[in-house]
């Protein structure tokens, strides 16, 4: 073995790529000139960039922190609101304006974002990075009845 070439530091070899045999082609060149064997090269697929674990998650966090659009899709949220309204309105079917649904969705997403921020602070206080259910429960308990939804 060469110096500095340990089994862990050597590059792994890739298996040889199979190359399909060249396709028979008819040449449109003049018959007096011999044509070189034409080889078609397959388009080389560029390998996807590999990120270290956690980098992609941080990129996603930064992307969503910069954006201002709603993160919950409108149709499922609308169905959920109508279902909850049917439950509490004794079977009456209310009609909703689209602006009212958007305002409710905006408020609910702001509430969830703030709850997750507080919950993550609770997990950091416990010297953890992973968010647990108990962190969310603690954040809601600290907020109280009015801010933590009961």
UniProtKB/Swiss-Prot annotation:
Q: What does this protein do?
A: Histone H3-like nucleosomal protein that is specifically found in centromeric nucleosomes. Replaces conventional H3 in the nucleosome core of centromeric chromatin that serves as an assembly site for the inner kinetochore. The presence of CENPA subtly modifies the nucleosome structure and the way DNA is wrapped around the nucleosome and gives rise to protruding DNA ends that are less well-ordered and rigid compared to nucleosomes containing histone H3. May serve as an epigenetic mark that propagates centromere identity through replication and cell division.
Similarity comment: Belongs to the histone H3 family.
Source organism (scientific name): Xenopus tropicalis (Western clawed frog)
Q: Which PROSITE patterns match?
A: HISTONE_H3_2 (PS00959)
Kindly list the places in or outside the cell where this protein is found, as annotated in its UniProt entry. Answer: Nucleus; Chromosome, Centromere
Primary localization class, coarse: nucleus
Q: Where is this region: H3-like?
A: 53-150
Protein origin, superkingdom: Eukaryota
Q: Which InterPro entries match?
A: Histone-fold, Histone_H2A/H2B/H3, Histone_H3/CENP-A
This protein's GO CC annotations? chromosome, centromeric region; nucleosome; nucleus
UniProt-recorded Gene Ontology molecular function terms: DNA binding; protein heterodimerization activity; structural constituent of chromatin
Disulfide pairings? none
Q: How does it assemble?
A: Component of centromeric nucleosomes, where DNA is wrapped around a histone octamer core. The octamer contains two molecules each of H2A, H2B, CENPA and H4 assembled in one CENPA-H4 heterotetramer and two H2A-H2B heterodimers. CENPA modulates the DNA-binding characteristics of nucleosomes so that protruding DNA ends have higher flexibility than in nucleosomes containing conventional histone H3.
Q: Which stretches does UniProt call biased (Basic residues)?
A: 42-53
Q: What is this protein called?
A: Histone H3-like centromeric protein A
């Amino acid at each position: 073995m060469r110096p500095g070439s340990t089994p862990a530091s050597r590059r792994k070899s890739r298996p040889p790529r199979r190359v399909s045999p060249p396709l028979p082609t008819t040449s449109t060149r003049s018959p007096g000139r011999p044509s070189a064997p034409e080889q078609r090269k397959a388009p080389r697929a560029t390998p996807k960039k590999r990120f270290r674990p956690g980098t992609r998650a941080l990129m996603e966090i930064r992307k969503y922190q910069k954006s201002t659009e709603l993160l919950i899709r409108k149709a499922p949220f609308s169905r959920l609101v109508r279902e909850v309204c049917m439950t509490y309105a004794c079977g009456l079917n209310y009609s909703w304006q689209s602006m009212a649904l958007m305002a409710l969705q905006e408020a609910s997403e702001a509430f969830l974002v703030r709850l997750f921020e507080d919950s993550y602070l609770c997990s950091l206080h416990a010297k953890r990075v992973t968010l647990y259910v108990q962190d969310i429960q603690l954040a809601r308990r600290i907020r109280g009845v009015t801010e933590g939804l009961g």
